C-alpha cells in the first residue's frame, strides 16, 4: 500500500500552487513561530486563488493557547489540527471539546516516544514522528534513526491510527524509508529549493514513493 503524502510548511502563493498540482493527500501550514510561519489571512487569500484539488488542509501549532487555535480554524477551511509541541492528553481533550476536527500529534523521537504515544491513546487521529532537534520543533531537515520506525508503526496499528514519518526526508533518501512501510510521509524542507517548494523535487519524491513520474493530482 502506498503511503500518504503530506507537504508541510507552505508559506507563499507559489508554494501552494506547486503543492496543489502534486499528488499530496495533505497540505500543511505552520502557525507556530518559525521561518515558515504564516497567518490565516495569508492562507485564505492563497486558497481563494488556487484550487487544491480536494487535498486536505492541516493547520500546525506548537503549544498554542486553545483560544488562538479556535480563532484560526474558524477563519480558514482546515481539515486537521496538528499539535507539534508538548501538548498533553488533557490539552488535546480540551481542544477537541472546542473544535470538531481530527487532531494529529507530533512525537519527537526519543527513548520515550512510544510511551508518549500510549499516553495519547484514543484522543488523536494520527501521529507524526519527527526528529528531535534541540530548540526546534520541526522543519529542520534532520532525520532520526529509521530502524525504529517499525516500533512506532506497530504502536499506531495497535491504536488503529496512522503514523506519518517526518524529519529530513528528501528525494535522495526517501527510498531508504520506504521498506519500513510508513502509513504516511511528511515532508517540508526536502521538497524546497532556496526556501521555496520545488515542483522538480516534488516530482522526484512522487516518482520514488508512488512509482509514477506523471505529475498530476491523484
Curated annotation (Swiss-Prot):
Pfam families: PRAI. Pathway: Amino-acid biosynthesis; L-tryptophan biosynthesis; L-tryptophan from chorismate: step 3/5. Its EC number is 5.3.1.24. It catalyses: N-(5-phospho-beta-D-ribosyl)anthranilate = 1-(2-carboxyphenylamino)-1-deoxy-D-ribulose 5-phosphate. GO terms for biological process: L-tryptophan biosynthetic process. The keyword Amino-acid biosynthesis applies. InterPro entries: Aldolase_TIM (IPR013785), PRAI_dom (IPR001240), RibuloseP-bd_barrel (IPR011060), TrpF_fam (IPR044643). The keyword Amino-acid biosynthesis applies. HAMAP family: PRAI. Belongs to the TrpF family. This is N-(5'-phosphoribosyl)anthranilate isomerase. It comes from Halalkalibacterium halodurans (strain ATCC BAA-125 / DSM 18197 / FERM 7344 / JCM 9153 / C-125) (Bacillus halodurans).
